[in-house]
């Protein structure tokens, strides 16, 4: 029996966006994998959350746990998005005329290193502030981070159209609003679960409620601002959008949920 195309796309997203082993017996397809990136984000965020809970239960210091969790996230994604962040930072620093040339350069510039350092420090600070709320916040941030490129793909031209090895296939095969359907299903499930959690008095219900709304604005604004600045998007800026939205979402959750 032939597997449905959506399942093959999901299998393709699984191995494209992570270093997790491929699914046995299922031939992956890559044309429309971007729509499933938010689902992969939930898986990776879930693994980070699991590591956090295990190490905290083992009485590891929170600062060490935060570092290891961030390191795990970088490894699970194969450094794909962090590489895009550094290349995009170098491109922005080079100016519009030399932007793509700087982003294509295999050498990392000072701006790329600074961007990576700042992002990691901000994520550590947010996780330390969140404390016991960090596991759920990691899930929320990973989801919204992977939603950001969907807006970039829908809204902006691809800067390296036709270039070998580019991520232009994301735009080439996208089918309008259907690309956002998997992400909408997650949000619908969350909106359905929240009232049930309120009934049973689950202590982290406020985190979930805040997370549904907190990530929306950065998931649209970050790719929008990057696209306007760069004159379009590329695979690098897709990755940068993921990392920046993750970081901003963690910070917003840290501020909102620990205020007072």
From Swiss-Prot:
Single GO cellular component term: plasma membrane
Membrane topology: Multi-pass membrane protein
Protein's GO biological process: cobalamin biosynthetic process
Reaction equation(s) it catalyzes: alpha-ribazole + adenosylcob(III)inamide-GDP = adenosylcob(III)alamin + GMP + H(+); alpha-ribazole 5'-phosphate + adenosylcob(III)inamide-GDP = adenosylcob(III)alamin 5'-phosphate + GMP + H(+)
One Gene Ontology term of the molecular function aspect: cobalamin 5'-phosphate synthase activity
Top enzyme category: transferase
Alphabetized Pfam families for the sequence: CobS
UniProt cross-references to InterPro entries, sorted A to Z: CobS
Lineage top rank: taxon: Bacteria
EC number: 2.7.8.26
Transmembrane segment boundaries: 3-23, 36-56, 60-80, 108-128, 133-153, 180-200, 206-226, 239-259
Keywords: Cell inner membrane, Cell membrane, Cobalamin biosynthesis, Magnesium, Membrane, Transferase, Transmembrane, Transmembrane helix
Pathway: Cofactor biosynthesis; adenosylcobalamin biosynthesis; adenosylcobalamin from cob(II)yrinate a,c-diamide: step 7/7
Protein's cellular compartments: Cell inner membrane
The protein's required cofactors: Mg(2+)
Family, per entry: Belongs to the CobS family.
Its biological purpose: Joins adenosylcobinamide-GDP and alpha-ribazole to generate adenosylcobalamin (Ado-cobalamin). Also synthesizes adenosylcobalamin 5'-phosphate from adenosylcobinamide-GDP and alpha-ribazole 5'-phosphate.
HAMAP family in the record: CobS
Protein's recorded name: Adenosylcobinamide-GDP ribazoletransferase
Protein species of origin: Prochlorococcus marinus (strain MIT 9303)
Lineage of source species: Bacteria, Bacillati, Cyanobacteriota, Cyanophyceae, Synechococcales
């Amino acid at each position: 029996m032939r597997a449905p195309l959506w399942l093959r796309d999901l299998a393709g997203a699984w191995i494209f966006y992570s270093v997790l082993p491929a699914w046995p017996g299922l031939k992956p397809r890559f044309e429309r994998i971007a729509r499933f990136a938010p689902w992969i984000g939930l898986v990776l965020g879930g693994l980070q959350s699991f590591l956090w809970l295990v190490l905290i239960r083992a009485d590891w210091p929170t600062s060490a746990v935060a570092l290891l969790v961030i390191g795990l996230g970088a490894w699970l994604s194969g450094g794909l998005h962090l590489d895009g962040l550094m290349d995009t930072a170098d491109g922005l620093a080079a100016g519009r005329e030399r932007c793509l040339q700087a982003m294509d350069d295999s050498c990392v510039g000072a701006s790329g290193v600074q961007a990576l350092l700042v992002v990691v420090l901000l994520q550590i600070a947010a996780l330390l502030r969140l404390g016991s709320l960090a596991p759920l916040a990691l899930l929320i941030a990973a989801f919204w981070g992977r939603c950001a490129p969907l807006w970039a793909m829908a809204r902006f031209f691809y800067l390296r159209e036709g270039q070998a090895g580019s991520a232009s296939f994301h735009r080439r095969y996208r089918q309008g609003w259907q690309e956002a359907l998997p992400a909408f299903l997650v949000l619908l499930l969350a909106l359905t679960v929240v009232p049930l959690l309120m009934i049973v008095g689950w202590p982290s219900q406020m985190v979930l409620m805040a997370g549904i709304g907190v990530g929306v604005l950065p998931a649209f604004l970050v790719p929008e601002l990057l696209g306007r600045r760069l004159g379009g998007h590329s695979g690098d800026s897709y990755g940068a959008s993921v990392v920046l939205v993750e970081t901003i979402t963690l910070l917003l959750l840290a501020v909102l949920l620990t205020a007072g």
